[in-house]
Amino acid sequence: MIVAFCLYKYFPFGGLQRDFMRIASTVAARGHHVRVYTQSWEGDCPKAFELIQVPVKSHTNHGRNAEYYAWVQNHLKEHPADRVVGFNKMPGLDVYFAADVCYAEKVAQEKGFLYRLTSRYRHYAAFERATFEQGKSTKLMMLTDKQIADFQKHYQTEPERFQILPPGIYPDRKYSEQIPNSREIYRQKNGIKEQQNLLLQVGSDFGRKGVDRSIEALASLPESLRHNTLLFVVGQDKPRKFEALAEKLGVRSNVHFFSGRNDVSELMAAADLLLHPAYQEAAGIVLLEAITAGLPVLTTAVCGYAHYIADANCGTVIAEPFSQEQLNEVLRKALTQSPLRMAWAENARHYADTQDLYSLPEKAADIITGGLDG
């Protein structure tokens, strides 16, 4: 059977993109033909995928997305698929994977009346409505209960259309998959001295992920502690604004940016803490990757997956409304109390051993291929 996957952009280091890759690969491994429609593709593409790069010309994101949608619809009329799966919201999907927050709720919380008059707003609101409004048949694969509550608040979506997926962590991220003495070996590989503290932040879109908050927390540390602490920021974005902030706060030499690395599991083995003080995050797969790596986490309550950190007792969740002073204090405490970090790390490893943090691709593939397998 032919399963068509729709996503606007693919690059190897995005959370949505990684979930897409694992789900689509699982569907392909079950013997189905996987067709992918995308505006751009970075990195390797599995040979089993039929990759179609959709031509778009608009100078705006919402303009390109509208062109993409129209082109894909025309192509599907000529080359039908048995299932159409979206990783971005758009009309006509059989299944939607909700990697993002509710746009209507975000606008209600953050935007004023004038924003609602823009063509950008009209586009994104219409595409979300077409996915979630009552009477549609689109099956909705969700990551958190908070997402479901927000969408039902705005669209009164039928409850039976929602299905919560378990997380889907790559098995190679698990602490038990690392080589012996991985911490020492990977710290040496990255030029990190044993007495130095390594803070790690992973995720594209530095503004939304709260990289500024991490830099401010680093800068707030007592001088002797700050001098001995590094922050590695890994993700696809332009770091200039954040480099300038680090310079202004006197910690430029402590902060290192990487535009995407394929050795994140090694960095997690080498690090002392994961920082993820996000402003907005539908789920936050990196939080669970840290748990499975045995890496303590400092994060914010807005993250859909933050409750896992609390459940595992492997770090601290900063409540809303966010307090920079609280993050500063929690970071100082974590870095000066080694037994606390060790207890958090042990709790994380136990949680990784006893909870299902891994089966998202299989469960999603079951939903997508329901009625097609066999």
From Swiss-Prot:
Its main location: membrane. It is an enzyme of class 2 (transferase). GO terms for molecular function: glycosyltransferase activity; lipopolysaccharide glucosyltransferase I activity. GO terms for biological process: lipopolysaccharide core region biosynthetic process. One of its GO terms (cellular component) is plasma membrane. Residues 103-132 are annotated as: Membrane-interacting region. Keywords: Cell inner membrane, Cell membrane, Glycosyltransferase, Lipopolysaccharide biosynthesis, Membrane, Transferase. The keyword Manganese does not apply. Disruption phenotype: Deletion mutant synthesizes shorter LPS, truncated immediately after the inner core heptose residues. Mutant cannot produce flagella, demonstrating that flagella assembly in E.coli depends on the length of LPS. Mutation results in a complete lack of phosphate groups on heptose II and in only 40% phosphate substitution at heptose I, which destabilizes the outer membrane. It causes a slight increase in susceptibility to novobiocin and a major increase in susceptibility to SDS. UDP-alpha-D-glucose binds at residues 15, 19, 173, 208-209, 261, 281, 283-286, 289. It is a peripheral membrane protein. For the in vitro assay, an inner core analog, heptose2-1-dephosphorylated-Kdo2-lipid A (Hep2-1-deP-KLA), was prepared and used as the acceptor substrate. Belongs to the glycosyltransferase group 1 family. Glycosyltransferase 4 subfamily. This is Lipopolysaccharide glucosyltransferase WaaG. It comes from Escherichia coli (strain K12).
